Amino acid sequence: MEGALIVAGGNIDTGKEQILSEFIRQSGGPAASILVAVTASGSHPDDIFEYIATCLEDQGLGPGQCRLLPLYEKNVRDRQGRNLLTGDAPGIAQYLDGISGIWFTGGDQYYVRKAFVREDGSDTKLLARLRALHAEGLCIGGSSAGAAIMSRTMIGGGSNKGVLHRETLFSYEGYDQLCEEDPPCPPLIITGGLGFFPCGVVDQHFDARPRLLRLIEACFMNPSGQRLGFAVSEDTAFCYQAGSLTVLGAGSVYVVDTRQASRVQKGEYRDVGLMALQAGDS
């Protein structure tokens, strides 16, 4: 059976026990072998890996059961001097051998997209292997940027103000320059994610950052035609498996439904559905 997805909204704190314990359970329990992908972080891979490994061990994972995937932004190296740079690097798929779970950390989902997906949009060897393992039962978890990458259509960046005042972009073309400019009103970017979560667009940090408008716009403009959005609050996650979704943690998951919606003008919609789910809700 296809493995579970643990999709967390970032800043896991009081909900840590419930969220990470479920990830460990879905990955096989204390003896699970976990691969940690810190690709989104952009820097300090060893420090971030050690933090995640400690958090998982605190929630019951056996000591030494985590390993680091050395796949980072081009100028980053870990303490061993490693960086495989791309999911097509020779021998990279061997890092997935024997694992029962993988955790994607937060940061910038751009780096994950660039490392795991080829420029033409096809899967790298690493992503193709990861897909096959997930179909066989591998659990995939992630928080913040590690949640954003889960959906087929991904919010790559942007803000509510960007929806109102900037043209929506449908690729990461020119993104590095955009980051250097650091505009106060970044545009909404809608692009392809890794595609593990099949039900709609995922957004995160939802209770702490103003993101409702950008999620509505992303659903409404979704090139795949899916019109549902799943907005995860901080310190909250949902577990998805076999068509069923259950909320974990301290906050809420909001389901945005634009299937019957219409746009009045830019930033104004009619008939948008909004449903709130809390811990234990399915």
PLM features: what roles do these ranges have?
Residues 91, 95, 119-137:
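Catalytic-core regions built around general acid/base machinery
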Residues 1-32, 36, 40-50, 56-63, ...:
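C-terminal and late-domain segments of enzyme folds
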Residues 114-116, 152-155:
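Short acidic, glycine/serine/threonine-rich loops at helix termini
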Residues 51, 63-92:
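Functional beta-strand-loop-alpha-helix junction segments that form "active/interaction loops"
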Residues 6-7, 101-105, 141, 203:
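Structural motif
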